[in-house]
Amino acid sequence: MAYITKRGNSYSVRYTYEDEHGKSCDKWESFPTKEEATNRKKQIEHELAAGTFLIPSSVTVAEFLMDWLPKQCSKHKWAPKTYESNLSTIQNLIIPYIGSMEMQKLKPYHMENLYTTLSKTPCGSYIEGKKQELTEKQKQRFLSGTTIHEVHRLLGTAFQYAVEWGILVKSPVPVDSPKKSTQERTIWTVEEMRAALDSMEDPILHLAVHLTLVGALREGEIVGLTPEDLDFDAADGIGTFRINKSMQRVRKEALNQVDDGCIIKVFPDKLERSTTSLILKSTKTASSCRTIFMTSALKEELKKWLNQLAADEMKDPARYHDSGMLFRLPNGLAVEPVLIRKKFLKWQDAHPEFPRIVFHGLRHSSATYQLMISGGDVKAVQGTTGHATADMLVNTYAHIQQSSRVELGKKFESGFYAKPDTPSPQAVPAAGEPTISMTALLELLKNADPEVKAQLRLALLT
């Protein structure tokens, strides 16, 4: 039951409710007119009778999210990077803008205003929740639609829990999500991949890129390899390497929050008071665990690399720190993913004739090339790339090469404009050229067994 009391020039509604602990509490709400107070009284009595009454709460968005995050991490057994990524989104993209607002005062238009603000916000404006001083150049790079979509996704999930926990009656997050960015990734052609590999003199970079091009690996998977993952005699001597681990550098705060079941090893800190740790963890999904065929050139390079590791250890055994990893510095310490990226950036600066791509673009290039030479055998390529679903592979890596579009245009012209009783014009092969058609060749490749496909990659990459 609710009561109205006139207090000076305003009207107060007093009512009693039970909090989350079952304790009886009195609440007063003030209104400027009797009509508003009467409407609120009726609303309260209806909600109390229907069991839909929302317990008053002054908890802020920041307080709720920082309470919700570790609970979700524990419930869903997040990997350290997942926790770190979500924490970063909350600290840098949500709390600075709506963190001080009370949850129960949030409306859908507040969410829309947040998305609009973020779309005009430069990247890196906040790091670990602290405002950053940006250069004029940095101020011109704004958050992408994909990043804002991720904010929407996180808030949508979090606020649904707020409804379940009785903090909100309804989530204020709009149903329509911000549009993701659709910028096409830059990739290399096979000629560019081969030429780039030939020009790389740094042994660590050369091996890392070679492995990526053959196996479409992620950065963490490359440096997560150990010598035990190599089998030079497998597949009738073709040789294979196994992907089942990944190396990452994560914040210690994230490491302390997650279930350590997926963590294989935490490497010793190089610096005192370090706020991050280098870890070796199992791959994120079952499909990420896979075996990849070697090429003969890669096989020989790996053997030479193992000999170099043994030689490095013999130079000064007392000061050698055997990390147990395949990628090591001359002193035995593990090579981190960031070092591979830095080496690749340095190489790109020295070779401006190649299209500028991020290191992960090599994985895209390899996957796209393998889709082409396999005649679109998505399942075979999926076994190499480790994508969870075939759709994910196709949607992410089905780049259209310019040469393929030109060939498609020629085929359309020869087929579309040909008269019904006139055979389509055929290109006349030059002397010494094979006469097998592209269609027949792709069909042969599609139906070939994995060993033949591995040998084909060997021929193309050597």
Predicted regions and their residues:
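N-terminal core-binding DNA-recognition domain of tyrosine site-specific recombinases/integrases
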Residues: 3, 17, 70-161, 182, ...
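N-terminal DNA-binding module of tyrosine recombinases/phage integrases
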Residues: 7-112, 128, 310-322, 402, ...
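Short, basic (Lys/Arg/His-rich) helix/loop patches that form interaction surfaces
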Residues: 123-127, 198, 202-203, 215, ...
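Basic, Lys/Arg- and aromatic-enriched nucleic-acid-binding interface segment
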Residues: 127-145, 149-151, 164, 168-227, ...
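Catalytic-site neighborhood detector that most strongly recognizes the C-terminal catalytic loop/helix
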Residues: 179-180, 187, 245-249, 385-411
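Short, polar N-cap/turn motifs at the start of nucleic acid-interacting alpha helices
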Residues: 229-237, 375-398, 424
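C-terminal secondary-structure termini that scaffold catalytic or DNA-interacting sites
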Residues: 232-235, 245-289, 410-462
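C-terminal catalytic core of Y-nucleophile DNA break-rejoin enzymes
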Residues: 242, 250-273, 280-304, 321-344
